[in-house]
Swiss-Prot record:
GO terms for molecular function: endonuclease activity. Its EC number is 3.-.-.-. Gene3D superfamilies: Divalent-metal-dependent TIM barrel enzymes (3.20.20.150). It holds the Pfam family UvdE. The keyword DNA repair applies. Its cofactor is Mn(2+). Keywords: DNA damage, DNA excision, DNA repair, Endonuclease, Hydrolase, Manganese, Nuclease. It comes from Deinococcus radiodurans (strain ATCC 13939 / DSM 20539 / JCM 16871 / CCUG 27074 / LMG 4051 / NBRC 15346 / NCIMB 9279 / VKM B-1422 / R1). This is UV DNA damage endonuclease. Belongs to the uve1/UvsE family.
Amino acid sequence: MTSACEAVPQLGLVCLTVGPEVRFRTVTLSRYRALSPAEREAKLLDLYSSNIKTLRGAADYCAAHDIRLYRLSSSLFPMLDLAGDDTGAAVLTHLAPQLLEAGHAFTDAGVRLLMHPEQFIVLNSDRPEVRESSVRAMSAHARVMDGLGLARTPWNLLLLHGGKGGRGAELAALIPDLPDPVRLRLGLENDERAYSPAELLPICEATGTPLVFDAHHHVVHDKLPDQEDPSVREWVLRARATWQPPEWQVVHLSNGIEGPQDRRHSHLIADFPSAYADVPWIEVEAKGKEEAIAALRLMAPFKKD
């Protein structure tokens, strides 16, 4: 395996393309609940089948465009974690061969897969019902990753933010008790409001959970001038130490629309932090998706002589 300090970073596509190539279907909860049980099953069978086909196409798209990192949409299979309704689980079981084939397509193309579920998942909420629904949702996502044939390691990361602020001790205490399909893939990311990397690092170290560093969030949280602040490099390296092996390290990359303090993500990446130059895996969180990746490849350290 190439050293993290020697490799040219791999740029990751997040879920969709701006173009029509990778676009998934969904259904609203209100629409779903208006259906009869038979109609629900038929609806999810059609929707899940379509999304698996699109996912299989995403593997081909990544391979064709030399993209070696892809974030799975956490909305691939709506209603899969719906309490008291096992329709989604039954449909996904029926489609298990197709789902596994899609996973093999990514593996065969050398594409690493990750997932970053919705922010309503708050494992350390002070409300028991939210904690319960959060574990249920994470378990459903882990089931999808299992169905794709993905390893139960941070190579196939299942990423969360720290959750409810001021409850870091509660988060650290519950991680060891998470179901193995979740716990063994779990990673934590700093955010711009509740949890800085300094607050997450002790949790990551205590639980063996890798830290995904986001420089944009760090700049906003600490009100820094830009992503060239020396602390960005410090946190790249400190986060890297939580990854085993360090060559698996993932970071997030984004720019603000109207400057470093703007939380909104820009269409393209104009400012690439020099601290990321030797990071092996970079998820590009730009609105321009594949367009942002193409533009980045014209910049150092990606531009080929």
